Amino acid sequence: MKHLFVLTCLLFFACNNKKNNNNNNRTANQPTGFGTKNVAGVFYDTLPCADCPGMAAKLYLKPDNSFIMELAYIGKNVVYDLGKWSLTDSILKLTGTEGISQFKILNHATIKLLDNEGRMIYDTTNRRLTLQRNNTPFQPLQPVPVEGIFSADGNTMNILICAMGNNYPVALAPSAMSMKAAYNKAIHKKSEPLYAKLKGHFELRPSLNDTTTKDFFVVEHFMAFVPGQQCK
């Protein structure tokens, strides 16, 4: 099933909202002084859905300006979108593999979904269109699928995740130990980069090279290497 993201296309009342309100002709872009450091974090709430009782939406804005959106459709499936986020005044823009979505930052704790043109949505049905900051760490319901350029040199492994545009150190869960043997079999020279399809989660771990803590991508399921393929 095609991911239903851009989120505004999920909300049938938003896509078809015809309420005559003068504010609809103005964008929601107003300077507020928000910055990357005080916006990054986890936001969560249940949003309405056109063809299901609702969807539990969890948005993880990582400090490196990448994001993970988890949409758990009630009674159905869980899907993920990954990408980059940017901030212009009080407008949060998500550019993911499934399209672009925008939110208005109302305050430190609340962001509100905007329409496809970046305007406030005026909903006569009083459905909730906001996500609330959640101070608990992001824990995905399922392993997150990623694709990117993987390389290894001894015990040091890294991946450039295409959708996020960032490099992350890699660790292998016990269920993914076969990945290293598959990599050694597929490469033609030491540390050769290969396009990889993986599933896993992000986790803060001690660095292998120094005393700092780094954001690792922990592989839970190795799917495949695709020699010759590059990030689009």
Question: What is each model feature region?
Answer:
Residues 1-4:
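Positively charged n-region of N-terminal signal peptides that target proteins for export
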Residues 17-80, 95-154, 162-163, 167, ...:
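Lipid interaction determinants
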Residues 12-14:
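C-terminal motif of bacterial Sec signal peptides marking the signal peptidase cleavage site
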Residues 166-186:
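Beta-strand/loop nucleic-acid-binding surfaces
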Residues 180-199:
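Short nucleic-acid-contacting surface segments enriched for D/E, G, S/T with interspersed K/R
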